[in-house]
């Protein structure tokens, strides 16, 4: 333990508690964003009470006289907390202590910044010249041109000069600068920017404002730079104290984000005696300096000032928790997490489940022993002050509200916005007559055959339109698929491939998933101590695809949570005083192995994998992938697997579309193409559904088998819309409906075929018992009833089941199939539930 005073003069280690007395996570007023941002050329109104002396400046001149530290102050006060001040209210690398009490630099104060002084100004503790850095930045901004520009473009304005003019035109506040461009133009400037981001970015802002004022002196907004795309991306588990106060870039997945926290920037006080309002007081390092007396000369009452909230100026702040992505976790390791601080425009740029790449400044902050104690712990907390956020992987699809047909407030996703050349290429690709086949061949090309399964998965990627009616009824547009089959039939490989493509995709295993792990659970926030709701796999997969392996090994409590998710697409929570309904608009892709590790074709799907019928009926497509021995098929499969190990294995897929093009194609279609049913397609859907229902009628019999349910026609609509999306068509046509019926029949013939009759029977999916099996059981029960009425008296002697079986064989005129003892037991159980018989062990008695 150490007190604030004992650590205040240290020259090594993390920032001193004098500059950082509380966590920005625990105290909303202690963020670097709390430092004041002034408009260019204006000065704040001075207060009339004493302020504490500023800490040492970041900049020191060569003659050891304390020079101005305007660039550092500008960065900390002028960036709204995005890259400037550092968490916990200032502080930072002890080699570069900073001052935030000095006025913000104005681009008009060139001489004070050292621009015209003969004595160079250096960053304190380094040999970095402020004048040299400013000159290098100015040269880069004015003269940088991309390498692909030809000689005719050499006389045009540079890349970032064009960006500045666009920002002025749209009255923006940010200019994104690619760090690779800085390195290509001036590697030394890049190294200084990464090592001393606070100082260099502050000078960057000054240069930008100088250029902006040269172009348009009436422009009042403070334009700032946002750096992204560093040359090296740091792993979360490799962060160490040497990275503190340096610019870093790392990738991860958002697992929790706080609500928007209002952070005060300027405070206004009012005297309770005379009603006098003070001038705005700048919040310094998260502290509000309350006037000890009324500032009005006629009043001067002590301790009479109170904060007036509606006259204060606030800014947005958000705390985000970032977790390592699964591909970065080493063998046997657990994922690491780090806290992010987002301010102003970066707030709500990411949602839980998003995979992002963050560029920011790694900061350290002290932790007090208690809220009322100035003593601090010797262990510091770390976090990242964010400068820039972008989507991490271009190989994943976008997840920006792709299926809501009535969502007019859709956000712009930069990753799906295409240039004219790529859009023209996609338009040409969509008009090819074999685009459907090419897309299916491009999906998991290393997996041999399974063409119909791949086409079903392709429809799941494109998805249908979610329909929200004015009456409040909602119809989902997500397609759910279940893969059932023998081990070694590429089920898990297909899941892994779809997981890599899907937006916000979560991959989980049924054996390792609990009910709360899939939906949501209540936990205690380690930073604030509050009870918060943590999102589970299905909620994190909102607008994406949740892949569940080993679906048959999931616990009953976990499976029961899927009923609401797969149809209503919400998760209802009522725990620990938290009552909420969370969105889980996700497609579910699950795979299951049959019990006994081998599929028994004589049993139904439900009997093979022991899943409840109510859950199984919510899947749009159920595919059986069986391992049937066949010499010709086995030879072709072996050749395909062996060919994958050759160097030129990819050359065999000449017509396949590469994964980057495929994901961008699917993302664009999901976001921009919303097909509607044409009259011809609607008539075909109606006619086809009626034909499916007619298939359950048998000539000469009054019994009918259910071969389709209303859920099937909803599945057909979703499949038809997905097929139209593949062609970039605004209308669903008849051939889309025909292909949707074919895909549904293929899946139903595999999973819903009654092997006793050879016909499709949806009762196998909905109830687990086919209509023919139910009729057979009814016949058994009727025969046993007749025998009991003939041979047994009410309350009389009992009969053994073996005797009953012999009687059935003698009097079984209506029974055309072989009779087994387990069939007799099922029929007796049916009669016992009706109260006609009582079963006592191996005997039955009439009651």
From Swiss-Prot:
Protein role: Probable component of the MCM2-7 complex (MCM complex) that may function as a DNA helicase and which is essential to undergo a single round of replication initiation and elongation per cell cycle in eukaryotic cells.
Membrane-spanning ranges: none
PANTHER family per record: DNA REPLICATION LICENSING FACTOR MCM FAMILY MEMBER, DNA REPLICATION LICENSING FACTOR MCM4
Cellular component annotations (GO), alphabetically ordered: chloroplast; MCM complex; THO complex
SMART domains reported in the protein's UniProt record: AAA, MCM
Motif (Arginine finger): 617-620
Domain of life: Eukaryota
GO biological process: one example: pollen development
Transport recorded as keyword: no
Listed name of the protein: DNA replication licensing factor MCM4
Bias (Low complexity) ranges: 60-75
Gene field: MCM4
InterPro entries: AAA+_ATPase (IPR003593), MCM (IPR031327), MCM_4 (IPR008047), MCM_CS (IPR018525), MCM_dom (IPR001208), MCM_lid (IPR041562), MCM_N (IPR027925), MCM_OB (IPR033762)
Reaction it catalyzes: ATP + H2O = ADP + phosphate + H(+)
Coiled coil: none
Residue ranges of every copy of the MCM domain listed in the record: 435-641
Residue spans of biased composition, Gly residues class: 81-94
GO MF annotations in UniProt: ATP binding; ATP hydrolysis activity; DNA binding; DNA helicase activity; zinc ion binding
Recorded family membership: Belongs to the MCM family.
């Amino acid at each position: 333990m150490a007190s604030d005073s004992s650590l205040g003069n240290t020259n090594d280690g993390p920032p001193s508690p004098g500059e950082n007395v509380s966590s920005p996570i625990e105290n909303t007023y202690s963020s670097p964003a709390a430092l004041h941002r002034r408009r260019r050329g204006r000065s704040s109104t001075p207060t009339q009470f004493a302020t504490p002396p500023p800490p040492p400046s970041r900049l020191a001149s060569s003659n050891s006289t304390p020079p101005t530290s305007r660039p550092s102050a500008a960065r900390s006060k002028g960036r709204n907390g995005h890259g400037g001040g550092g968490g916990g209210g200032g502080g930072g690398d002890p080699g570069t202590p900073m001052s935030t009490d000095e006025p913000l630099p104005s681009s008009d104060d060139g001489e004070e910044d050292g621009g015209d002084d003969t004595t160079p100004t250096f960053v304190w503790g380094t040999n970095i010249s402020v004048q040299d850095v400013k000159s290098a930045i100015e040269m880069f901004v004015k003269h940088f041109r991309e390498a692909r520009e030809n000689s005719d473009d050499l006389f045009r304005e540079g890349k970032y000069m064009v960006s500045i003019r666009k920002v002025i035109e749209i009255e923006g506040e940010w200019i994104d600068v690619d760090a690779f461009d800085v390195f290509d133009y001036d590697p030394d400037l890049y190294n200084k920017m990464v090592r001393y981001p606070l100082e260099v970015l502050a000078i960057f802002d000054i240069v930008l404002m100088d250029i902006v004022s040269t172009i348009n002196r009436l422009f009042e907004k403070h334009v700032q730079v946002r750096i992204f795309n560093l040359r090296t991306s740091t792993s979360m588990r490799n962060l160490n104290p040497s990275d503190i106060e340096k610019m870093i870039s790392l990738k991860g997945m958002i697992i929790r984000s706080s609500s928007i926290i209002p952070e005060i920037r300027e405070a206004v006080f009012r005297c309770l005696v005379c009603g006098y309002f003070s001038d705005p007081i700048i919040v310094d390092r998260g502290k509000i300096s309350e006037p000890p007396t009324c500032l009005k000369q006629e009043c001067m009452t002590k301790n009479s000032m109170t904060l007036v909230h509606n006259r204060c100026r606030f800014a947005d702040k958000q705390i985000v928790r970032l977790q390592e992505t699964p591909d970065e976790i080493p063998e046997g390791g657990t994922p690491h997490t780090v806290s992010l601080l987002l301010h102003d425009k970066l707030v709500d740029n990411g949602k839980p489940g998003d995979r992002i790449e963050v560029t920011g400044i790694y900061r350290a902050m002290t932790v007090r022993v208690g809220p009322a104690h100035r003593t601090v712990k010797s262990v510091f907390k770390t976090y990242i002050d964010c400068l820039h956020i972008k989507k991490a992987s271009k190989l994943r699809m976008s997840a920006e509200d792709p299926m809501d047909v009535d969502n007019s407030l859709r956000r712009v996703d930069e990753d799906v916005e295409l240039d004219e050349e790529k859009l023209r290429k996609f338009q040409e690709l969509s008009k090819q007559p074999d685009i459907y086949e090419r897309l299916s061949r491009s999906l998991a090309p290393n997996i041999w055959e399974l063409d119909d399964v791949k086409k079903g998965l392709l429809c799941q990627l494109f998805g249908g339109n979610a329909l929200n009616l004015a009456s409040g009824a909602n119809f989902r547009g997500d397609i759910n698929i279940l893969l059932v089959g023998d081990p070694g039939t590429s089920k898990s490989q297909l899941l892994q491939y779809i997981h890599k493509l899907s937006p916000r995709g979560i991959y989980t295993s049924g054996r390792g998933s609990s009910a709360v792990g899939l939906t949501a659970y209540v936990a205690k926030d380690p930073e604030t101590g509050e009870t918060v709701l943590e999102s589970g796999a299905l909620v994190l997969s909102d607008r994406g695809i949740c892949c569940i392996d080993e679906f048959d090994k999931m616990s009953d409590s976990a499976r029961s949570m899927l009923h609401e998710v797969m149809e209503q697409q919400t998760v209802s929570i009522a725990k620990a005083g938290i009552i909420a309904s969370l969105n889980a608009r996700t497609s579910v892709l699950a795979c299951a192995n049959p019990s006994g590790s081998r599929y028994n074709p004589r049993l139904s799907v439900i009997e093979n994998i022991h899943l409840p019928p109510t859950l199984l009926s919510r899947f749009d497509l159920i595919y059986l992938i069986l391992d049937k021995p066949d010499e010709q098929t086995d030879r072709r499969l072996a050749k395909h697997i062996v060919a994958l190990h050759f160097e030129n294995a990819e050359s065999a897929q000449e017509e396949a579309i590469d994964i980057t093009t495929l994901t961008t194609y699917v993302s664009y279609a999901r976001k921009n193409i919303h097909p509607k049913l044409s009259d011809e397609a609607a008539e075909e859907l109606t006619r086809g559904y009626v034909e499916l229902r007619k298939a359950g009628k048998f000539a000469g019999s009054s019994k009918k088998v259910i071969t389709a349910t209303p859920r099937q026609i909803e599945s057909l609509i979703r499949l038809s819309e997905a097929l139209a999306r593949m062609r970039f068509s605004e209308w669903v046509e008849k051939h889309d409906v025909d292909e949707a019926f074919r895909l549904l029949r293929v899946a139903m013939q595999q999973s819903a075929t009654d092997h006793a009759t050879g016909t499709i029977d949806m009762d196998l999916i909905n109830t687990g018992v086919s209509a023919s099996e139910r009729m057979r059981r009814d016949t058994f029960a009727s025969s046993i009833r007749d025998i009991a009425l003939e041979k047994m008296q009410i309350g009389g002697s009992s009969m053994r089941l073996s005797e009953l079986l012999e009687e059935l064989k003698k009097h079984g005129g209506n029974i055309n199939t072989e009779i087994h003892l387990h069939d007799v037991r099922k029929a007796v159980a049916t009669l016992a539930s009706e109260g006609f018989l009582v079963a006592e062990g191996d005997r039955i008695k009439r009651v």
